[in-house]
Amino acid sequence: MSGRNRIHRDIRDSYHDHRDLPPERPFLRGPPLLQPPPPSLLEDLQIQEGEIRRQDAEIRRLLSDNHGLADDRMVLERELVAAKEELHRMNLMISDLRAEQDLQLREFSEKRHKLEGDVRAMESYKKEASQLRGEVQKLDEIKRELSGNVQLLRKDLAKLQSDNKQIPGMRAEVKDLQKELMHARDAIEYEKKEKFELMEQRQTMEKNMVSMAREVEKLRAELATVDSRPWGFGGSYGMNYNNMDGTFRGSYGENDTYLGSSERSQYYSHGSGSQKKPRLDRH
């Protein structure tokens, strides 16, 4: 419509443009005067008519163009409405896509956070796995050591089992040794008692020897006094006539027994206390 107004305004301006025309005469009332137009005016009129025709053709062309533009405008308006509808539909689709994209982004972010947590957990698992590998190696070393110890223990067990088979014999030997020990203890006790008795016998023998030595001294003194006297035949001590040894008749009522000096010493050395008691059999 603005194009149409612009075209009519141009036409109106072209009709009112009198720059090429002669100046108008004052308008007179009454019938017009018939005067022949000058030739220049005719030429101008012809020119103006040609210009009018040209402008009319231009106007028609512009009108046809305006109709075409109006049709194009209607088509464009229809297309604009369709485009607006399509745009609205596209906006709805875009909003749906954005919502879906936001949902996917949230899911992706959640998955990313979950994966990051899994990665951190995997790092901790890796550390734990390395620690467990070290512990497994240590346990393998301990296992090897224990296997060696088990072999040694098995050898010791076999040895102990073989030794256990010898235990009954060893027990019998221990019992025999205990019996021998008891016999030895009894023998030691008997030896102690016997030694004590021997000590008592020795003391009594020493006392007897001292008393006998005194008697011998007395006898020697008596002999000395007897030697100073004259010898008689068949004296009181029964000395033989041809025996110069000075033997005496045996004591304790022995008949026809005479003891010399050596026999007397043996007799006094083997007193009654020197006789040993018979030993008892060991249990």
Swiss-Prot record:
One of its GO terms (biological process) is flower development. Residues 1-37, 252-283 are annotated as: Disordered. PANTHER family: PROTEIN FLX-LIKE 2 (PTHR33405), PROTEIN FLX-LIKE 3 (PTHR33405:SF20). Disulfide bonds: none annotated. Has no transcriptional activation activity. Residues 258-275 have a biased composition (Polar residues). This is Protein FLX-like 3. The keyword Coiled coil applies. Disruption phenotype: No suppression of FRI activity. One of its GO terms (cellular component) is nucleus. The gene is FLXL3. Residues 40-229 form a coiled coil. Interacts with FRI. InterPro entries: FLX/FLX-like (IPR040353). Residues 8-27 have a biased composition (Basic and acidic residues). Keywords: Coiled coil, Developmental protein, Differentiation, Flowering. It comes from Arabidopsis thaliana (Mouse-ear cress). Belongs to the FLX family.
